Amino acid sequence: MLFRSVAGCDTPYTIPLPGRHHVQDALAAVAVCRQLGLPEEAIRQGLEGAAVPGRAQVFPNHRGIRVVVDYAHNAASFRAILSCLHCYPHGNIIVVFGAGGNRPPMRRLDMAQVAAELADCAIVTTDNPRWEPVEDICRSITQALGRQIPWEVIYDRREAIFRALDLAQPGDMVALLGKGHEGYIETCGLRLPFSEWTVLEEYFHRQP
C-alpha cells in the first residue's frame, strides 16, 4: 500500500501490507523514526521490507482464490482485516475462525457479529481452546451468527481450512483468522504443532 505523510515531507512510502490500519501503524513508526533523526530514505526502505508473518499475509495459489492469513483475534482486528478485504474486487468472502478459550465470552460474540456483517460464509473451528471445551466455544459463536450468514462447524482446523478452500471459487476470498504466525494450537495445557501456512501448502500441492 502506497501512502504519504504530511508534516513537511512529501516522501512516498510503501508498505507490503494492505489496509488503513497498517498505514496508521506505519505513520506512527515514521513519526518515531523522524524524532530519532533517521534519514527519510532509511525510513522508506525500512517500511518497504516490513512484512509481518501472519498479518494480512497472502498465500499465492494457482486457483484464483485470494487466501489471507491474519492474527485477528478480537472484534476490532476482525473489522480491520475484513473491511480491508472489501476494498479489493472479490466474490464471496469465506472466513475461518474460532475463539480463544478461557477468555471473556463477549469477545467471541463480538467477533461473530463482525463476521456476520462483513463475510458471506463462516467455517467455525478450533482456535486455542485452552481448558475450555471447543464445543462450547463454537456453540457460542454459532448462536451469535444465527441465520445472518451460512455457517458450518468443523472442529478440526485443518479440515475446516480444507472445507473453506473447497467451497471457494475463483475470485472469492478465504480469510483464516486468529492464528496468524502461531505454530501451535493450545489445548489442555499442551501446545500442539499446527501451522496454517503448512496446511495451505498441503492443500494446494494436492490440486491439479
Predicted regions and their residues:
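Glycine-centered tight beta-turn/hairpin loop motif at sheet-sheet or coil-to-beta transitions
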Residues: 6-10, 64
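C-terminal accessory "lid"/substrate-recognition subdomains
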Residues: 21-22, 57
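ATP-dependent carboxylate-amine ligase
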Residues: 28-208
